Regions:
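Small-molecule-sensing regulatory modules
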Residues: 2-4, 8-187
Length: 187
């Protein structure tokens, strides 16, 4: 909401509740002129035909971990952990690790107006983060990258955590803590 209002303060943006089918039905019933849903979710549900426009990441940075799937299992079940290890996508793991480290370092929750996008390009982990006021009239951004080449998997995870913390520190220096507090107080 905050990112949309930051770009288009002339819009009336409302929250919408329910699962994807419920939200689409509300759109079809004329309750809304448009709705914004995660592209990855619509694709996963086989609803690609409902996508009419994809908002570029330069306009709206996704929520932390957007589009990534996680699998949980018992920590003490070595066999299941070994089976699941083959499902792990190392690039997704390292990007989500960085994004979550940023969110954790900001002490922000899932409802805070915070966006993050990590990607691996040419052996470097790039991370972009944004924090906005609840109404989107104030915004702070940060981006950085770190080389992953020739690092072990655990070293890559440590590097991703460090990158997320670095981005958070930059955002905090720019006033992110106050923006998050203001958004939390007005929620």
């Amino acid at each position: 909401k905050a990112q949309r209002l930051n770009q288009r303060p002339d819009l009336r943006v409302e929250d919408i509740r329910g699962n994807v089918d419920t939200r689409l039905q509300k759109l079809d019933d004329g309750n809304y002129e448009a709705i914004i849903l995660a592209e990855s979710g619509l694709k996963r549900l086989g609803l690609v035909e409902r996508i009419t426009h994809v908002i570029d990441r330069s306009i709206m940075i996704p929520a932390v971990g957007q589009g990534a799937l996680g699998i949980e299992c018992r920590e003490d079940d070595a066999h299941v952990r070994q089976v699941l290890a083959h499902l792990n996508d190392s690039e997704t793991f390292v990007t989500v690790t960085a994004e979550r480290a940023m969110l954790r370092s900001l002490r922000a929750g899932c409802l805070a107006p915070v966006g993050a996008f990590g990607q691996v390009v040419d052996g470097k982990l790039q991370l972009q983060g944004v924090v906005l006021s609840g109404m989107g009239d104030q915004r702070v951004d940060a981006k950085a990258e770190i080389a992953l080449a020739e690092l072990s998997e655990s070293e890559q995870a440590n590097a991703a955590n460090t990158l997320g913390q670095t981005i958070a520190e930059d955002l905090i220096r720019q006033g992110a803590t106050e923006l998050i507090s203001e958004a939390r107080d007005n929620a």
